[in-house]
Amino acid sequence: MGTYVVRRMFSTVAVMAMVGIFVFLLLRLAPGDPAAMIAGKSATAEVIAGIRQQMGLNDPIPVQFIRWVRDILGGDFGTSIFAGRPVLELISQRLEPTLSLSILTMVLSATVGVCFGILAAWRAGGLVDRILTGFATLGFSVPVFVVGFFLIYFFAIKTHWLPVQGYQPIESGFWPWLMHLILPTITLSIPYLAFIARITRASMLEVLSEDYMRTAAAKGASSYSMLVHHALKNAGAPILTVIGLSFAGLVGGVVITETVFNIPGVGRLVVDAINNRDYPIIQGVLILVAGLYVLINLAVDLSYTLVDPRIRY
Amino acid sequence: MVMGSFLRAFDPVSTTDDTSQSHGLAIFDTLFALDSKFMVQPQMVQKWGISDDQKTYTFELRDGLGWHDGSAVTAADCVASIRRWAQVQSGGQLMMKRVKDISKKDDRTFTIALKEPLGLLPEILASAPPLFIMREKDANRPATEQVTTNIGSGPFKFNEALSKPGASITYDRNEKYVPRRDRADGFAGGKVVNVDRVIWENIADQQTAYAALQAGEIDFIQSPSVDLLPIIESNPDLRLQVLDKGGRILLLRMNCLQKPFDNVKSRQAILHLVDQEAFLQAAFGNPKYFRTITSLFGNDTPYSNDENTGWFKKGGDPETAKRLLKESGYAGEKIVILQPTDWAESSNATQLLAAELRKIGANVELAPSDWGGIVERRAKMGPVEDGGWSLFITDHSNYSTTQPHTNIDLAANGKEGWYGWPTSNEYESLRAKWLEAKTLEERKALAREMQKNYWDIVGMVYLGAYVQPSARRMSLTGLIGMPAYLPMWNMQKVSG
C-alpha cells in the first residue's frame, strides 16, 4: 500500500502542475486586465499602462510564467494584486468557513442520506420509499438559493431564531459558529443528501437481492443486522465514492451558498478574484483545490479497504 | 455597512474607484475639502496665502495632526503626497504643467511655486478624486504601485487584524484625531466620529443584504438595486435617502477614430436617435429616480445652460437620425456595442440602443462581457475587425461636469483623451480658458461656448441622469450627502 500511496502522491503533484499551467495560460488568454480594474472606471489609458508596467504584466507570457513557477517552487504563491497580501494568507483566512460548511454539510448529508437510502431500499416500492424518493427528486430539483431564501425568511426574519448571514470563526465560540452555519448547512445539504440517498438506495437494492442476504435471513439475522452489517457494508464502496467526491466538490463549489449567506469562504474568494482579474489568487486557489481534490480521491480509494477486505493496494 | 461596490484597491490615489475614495476619506486626511456647496475649505491646512505676483502659494498645517502610527504629520509628507497624486490624477497633472517647485519650508509649512499664475490651485487641490495626504515613505513610491499600509492621519484607523480583504473591512475611531472646530459640512468641517467602529461587509447578493438590513444585522446599503426600492420604502424600520442629490449621468461613448463614428454626422445621428426617457425607463424603471439632461454641464450646476440643445425633444427622432446616418456615408459597417453583463442598468440600456440602431438600418453586434473585459477592450483604438469597439455606455457624476479642466470625459483632445477620443481644437482652446477665467460669470459664459461647440461635434451622448438612493435603518442618522463618496464621520447610531 505504501508504494501505491507514494505513486498517487506523485500523480497529485503532476495534476497540480497541469492545472497550474492550464490556469495560467487561460487567464492570460482571457479578456480583462487587472491594471484597468485597479485604476477604476474613469482612469486614463496612460495610468493603466503605468500600472501594467509596474506589475510586470507587460513582460512576455513565458517570462511571467517562469517567474511564477520559480516562486511557487519556493513556496511563494504570490501576492494579491488588490489586497497586497500573500495569497496563502488570504486563502487560509477563507478556508475555515468553507471547511466548516463543507464538513457540516457532509456529516448531515451522509448521515441522513444513507439512512434515507437504507430505509427506501428496505421498504422498496412502499409508501416510505415513495416519500423518500419523492423528497430526493425534489431535493435535486430545487435550486439552493431558493431553499436558502426560504429558510432565511422563516428562521431569520420571521422568527429571529438564526442570523440571516455572516460567519463567526470557531474561536469566537462554538454556539455563535454553529448558529451562523445551521441555515447554510441545511440549504447546501439538501441536494447532496438527495444524491446520497438515491445512490445508497440503488446500491442497497442490488445487494439485498444477493444470495448471501437470503442466507443471512435464513440464519435468523435481525433486520438491523442484515441491513447494516451485511448489506450496507457490501454496498459501501459506491456510497463512499459519492461522499468523497461530493466533499471534494463542496470545498471548491459552495459559491452560491456562500453568496446567499454571505460566508467569506474560498468560493467567494475565487469568484471575486475572477471578477477583479486577481491572477495570483485565482491560480493559487485552483492549484490548491486541485491538490485537495486528488488527495480526497486518494483517501476515498484507501477507505475502500475498510469496507471491502478483498481490495488490496 | 454594505458599500455600492466592495473595496478592491486600498490605495485611493492609484485608482478612481469610488469605494476606494470612501476608504481614503475614512483613514486619510486632505489639505482642502469641498463643503456641501462645493466651496473650497481648508482641512489639514491652518492658513494659506499667495504671493503678490500670484505665483507662490504658502501653506501652513494646523496643530495636532498625527499619523496612526504615532508620528506627526509634516510638510514633507504633504510635498511627497502632492507629487505622487499629481502623477496620476488629472487635476494634479494639469497643475504640474505650471508648477516650478514644491518644497517644504519647515515641519509645518510648504510652498508651491508656479511658472505662471493658477487661480484655481486651491480648487484643484480640493477636487475629486481627493488629494489624500500619506506618510512621506509611502508617498515616495510610484503612484502606479499600490500603497497598502493603510496608515493615514484621518478620523478612522484601519483595523488590519479584523479586516479580511474581499470579505469585510473594519475601521476604528481614531481617538487621537483632532477635528476642526467647524461644523461638519460636506467633505469639510469638523470630522467628529460618533461611532466606535464601522464594518464594511461584502454582501454580494442584494436580497441577502436587504434581509440583513431588515433583521438589523447591518445598518446601511449604499446602492440597493432598483427592484428592492419599493420594498424598502414600505418598511417602517428602514428609510431610503438620496445622499448624492446631483446623481450620475448615464452616457454613451463613441469610437471617433473608426467608422462609422469618425464621421460627425453619424455621431449627430445618435444624438437625435436617443430618447432619454426610454433609456432611463429601461435602465432604472422608476421615474422618481431619474430625469432627462440636456446640458453638457449637468443638471442644476452653476454652469448648466440651454445652449445648442435643439436636438433634444421628448421621444427621440429616428427619422432625422436615419437621414444623418445616411448622410454620413454609412455603408452597413459593423457597429460593435460593448455590453457589461455585470452592470444591469447599463446592460439594459445597451440592448435598447442596439434595438434602436437596428430600426434605422444599422448593422449592430453586441459584445457581452463583464466590466473587466470592457475596460480592457475599450482601450483598443483600432477597427472592430481587430478587436476594437464602436460604442459603450458608462457614467460619470453630475458634479464632475463642473470641472471640465480635470474631468477627462469632457475633453476633446483626441488620442490623448479618454476612450472614444473625440477631437476638436476649437473646443479644446475653449476648455484651456477655464483655468484663466477669474469669476463665476466668466466661467458661465465659457460653459455656454463650450457646450455650443460640443453638441456640434458630439464627443459623447447623454442618455439621462439618475440618482441612487441608499437604504438605512432609522437608527442610523447623520449621514453626509455628497457626490459619489461616503464620509463616515458625523453619522451616529441611536437606539430603536
Locations of regions flagged by a protein language model:
Chain A
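Membrane-water interface segments at transmembrane-helix boundaries in multipass membrane proteins
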Residues: G84, T133-R198
